Amino acid sequence: MSMNPIKKTEETVAAPAVNKISITLTSRNPKSLEKVCADIITLAKNKKVKAKGPIRIPNKVLKITTRKSPCGEGTNTWDRFEMRIHKRVIHILSTQDFVKEMNTISIEAGVDVEVIMDKKEAKN
C-alpha cells in the first residue's frame, strides 16, 4: 500500500518578511524622550503593528567633582556636577515599510535614536 504523493498546483504567494525592530532612544531630557516614544507607539498602533515598550532602562548618572579654586590655595571647596542619561527601548514586529513610515516622525533635539533590524526566525 503505497500512497501517491499529493502535488500542490497552487503557487504560494510570498508574504512580506516580518522583521524584529529594536529602537533604542537616549536623551538627557526625559520629557522630550517620552514624547518621541509616545509618537512611535501611536504610529505603531495606527498601523496595527505589534509593539512592546517603551521599556525603561535604568538611568546612568555621570558625576564629576572639581575644586572651585583654580590656584589650589584657600579653603578646600568643591563643585559637584552630574549628568543623567535616560534610555528607552521599543520592540516592534513589522515589515520594512514601517521603518519608512517612522522617518516621518519629528525627533526633538537631544534625542538619539538607534534602530536595529533582525529577521524573525520562523518556528518549525
UniProtKB/Swiss-Prot annotation:
Tree of life domain: Eukaryota
GO MF: RNA binding; structural constituent of ribosome
GO CC terms, sorted: cytosolic small ribosomal subunit; extracellular matrix
GO biological process, one term: translation
This protein's UniProt keywords: Ribonucleoprotein, Ribosomal protein
A Pfam match: Ribosomal_S10
PANTHER family for the chain: 30S RIBOSOMAL PROTEIN S10 FAMILY MEMBER
UniProt family annotation: Belongs to the universal ribosomal protein uS10 family.
Name used for this protein in its record: Small ribosomal subunit protein uS10
Organism annotation: Dictyostelium discoideum (Social amoeba)
Highest classification ranks of the organism: Eukaryota, Amoebozoa, Evosea, Eumycetozoa, Dictyostelia
Name of the gene this protein is made from: rps20
